[in-house]
Amino acid sequence: FVPWGAHEMRGNYKTRWKYLYYVFYQQKLKYKKFKSFFLATVLAIINPFLYKNMRLIPTYQDIRFTKSLRESLSYLDDGIPILVFPEDSSEGYDEIIVKFNEGVVVLADYVDKHRDIDIPIYPVYYSKRKRVIEIGKKASYRTLKDKGHTRAEIADILRRHVNKLYENIKLRKLKEKR
């Protein structure tokens, strides 16, 4: 698979460092300044090599997003799946996801329009604390669209699928403790 990621991570050292320090470590992960500084300084050096080898597709919040869609389509044409983290993590990462961004739905719509393909969307939940990954049943963009759902509604349906996976993990862990 090829992941989507913040375009800042494909920028120069200063751009990567600022994103890691201010946004990723402090805003999203809630790390203290020293830990954020140390990690941002080290990882801003290493990340270009990691992301180049991962073939990270940079995502944007503006018109350049069409570039992300075109690049994604070329990988899909080659049979390579795209990994999207659609949760809104602007306030940090929570176990129960409050909001999904619509990018994954926009991608599904783009592929549908340009290739007439209903790409499967698999909801996935990873619990770092419980060290478990749960993969749900595939969702069909066309089916949801044909039912009259908007992009925002489809994103929310997918979010609820992912949160259900989290609930499954919790229930399974409770049963294991008994």
Predicted features by range, described:
Residues 61-178:
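Non-catalytic C-terminal accessory region of glycerolipid acyltransferases
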